[in-house]
Amino acid sequence: MTKTVFVLNGPNLNLLGKREPGIYGVATLDDIEASCKREAGQLELQIDFRQSNHEGDLVSWIQEAGEKNAYVLINPAAYSHTSVAIHDAIRSARVTVVEVHLSNIHAREAFRHHSHVSAVAKGVICGFGAEGYLLGLRALAAIAKEEEKNGQSIKGA
C-alpha cells in the first residue's frame, strides 16, 4: 500500500533561494518539491507538497493528514518556536510527524533553540539543508514498512 506524506512548509519558505542563502541554501522551494517527488517515487510514497505563511492553514492541513491517515513531514519554520496551535494540532490529530529544518536551529540564536513541534514529532532533522527533506522521507518510508510488517499504525511521537 502506498502511504501519503503531507510535506508542509511554513512562513517565508516561499522565498527560499533568495532569502539568506548563506543560512538556508540556494535551493528554491520548487527545487525541494521536485527532489521530494523523485525520492518519494523511489520510496513508494505519495507526497502532497504545500506551503503557507499562515498558521491556520498549517493547522488545518495537519488535521486533514490525520483524517486521511497520512504522515507529515513539516518544516514549520519560525512557527517551530512560537506555535502552540501547531503543537496541539499534531497531538490531537495523532499523526506521525517528522520535523525538518534547513539550518541547525540549535547552532543559531537562542530563541530558535526550542521547538514546540519537536515535543510531538517522531523525530527531528536539522542542519542538512534541502537534503533534510529527503532524510525525512526516508525515515517515514521506514516507519511505513515497519507498520506494514506489523500490521499496525504507529501514531504520534
UniProtKB/Swiss-Prot annotation:
Name any Gene Ontology BP term.
amino acid biosynthetic process
Q: State the reactions this protein catalyses.
A: 3-dehydroquinate = 3-dehydroshikimate + H2O
Work out whether the entry's keyword set contains Amino-acid biosynthesis. yes
Give the stretches traversing the membrane: none
Q: What residues does substrate bind to? A: N75, H81, D88, L102, S103, R112
Mind telling me which residues the site (Transition state stabilizer) is annotated on?
R19
According to UniProt, this protein's pathway is: Metabolic intermediate biosynthesis; chorismate biosynthesis; chorismate from D-erythrose 4-phosphate and phosphoenolpyruvate: step 3/7
Q: Which gene encodes it?
A: aroQ
| Function of the protein | Catalyzes a trans-dehydration via an enolate intermediate.
Keywords (alphabetical) are:
Amino-acid biosynthesis, Aromatic amino acid biosynthesis, Lyase
What family does the Swiss-Prot or TrEMBL record give for this protein? Belongs to the type-II 3-dehydroquinase family.
Any GO MF annotation of the entry: 3-dehydroquinate dehydratase activity
Active-site residue list = Y24, H101
Outline the subunit composition.
Homododecamer.
Xref: PROSITE patterns: DEHYDROQUINASE_II (PS01029)
UniProt-recorded name of the protein:
3-dehydroquinate dehydratase
List its EC numbers.
4.2.1.10
